[in-house]
Amino acid sequence: MKNPIKWAIIAVLLSTVVAKKIVGEGMADVSAIKHPEEVHPTNRDFLRSLIFSISMIFGCEIGDKTFIVAALLAFENSRLTVFAGSYSALFIMTLLGVLLGHAAPLLFPRKLTDILGGVLFVIFGIKMLMEAKEVMDSKESMSDEFQNVRNEIAANGPIDQLLEEGAAPSHYTGHRSRSGHTLMSQLKSKGRNVMATLFSPLFIKAFALTFVSEWGDRSQIATIAMAASDNVYGVFMGANVGHACCTALAVISGKYISTKIKVHKVMFIGGILFIAFGLVYFYQGFF
């Protein structure tokens, strides 16, 4: 889905929530008091929601731009710092998506949110299948995707210079106080080094690149749809577990995976998963 359409979907959802707050308490709130189980589908199977969201994230993120960004940044830099920066951005995006999806049943009937979720998943699934066919016909490999993302990053400045900025500030490295032999001073020194590493320019760069890449992405919109129709706690936990696994996979073995994975196969599997999820939500909405 093109970026303007993605932004439009998110804008509509956000504006609806804001309008709800401005107008005040409406019929949806009355319904929530009388029939709370029909508004927030938290009584739905937690395990199913967990599995659905993990599968959705894997289908979206393996080989996606955020995956490639993490892999590229981790090639010659601290994997821990890259993981922390990338995952922090994904965690925040997941939280925003889940909160927005959780608000949807207060604005629309539950069956309608199920049907709308089904429509989104089917559309995304069909689009992924079409993209998979295009990639297969063009014989584009994962290595080509890596190069494309590398070029995008390099467009903002030389890639080597951008990555070198992630070095921890020198004044933190090797710092020891006069009482450095005491346990407390050693703990303080290690704490400063850890903070300098985690919140270094590399951390900020990984966070920013991931946040920008993920905003309005297919996985974020899918998370909103799932949170609106399924157990919100299961979706939140599953999405974060999926993001953690995919990001860890990217920073640990992204370069190796790029030579083994076929882009069109990943997109094909993701498309099938999305269509299957859509059918499940259609069933919930109509029956």
From Swiss-Prot:
Record's bilayer topology term: Multi-pass membrane protein
UniProt key word Transmembrane helix: yes
Main location: membrane
Superkingdom of the source species: Eukaryota
Residue spans crossing the bilayer: 7-27, 50-70, 89-109, 112-132, 194-214, 232-252, 267-287
Database matches in InterPro entries: GDT1-like, GDT1-like_CS
Name of the protein: GDT1-like protein C17G8.08c
Protein source organism: Schizosaccharomyces pombe (strain 972 / ATCC 24843) (Fission yeast)
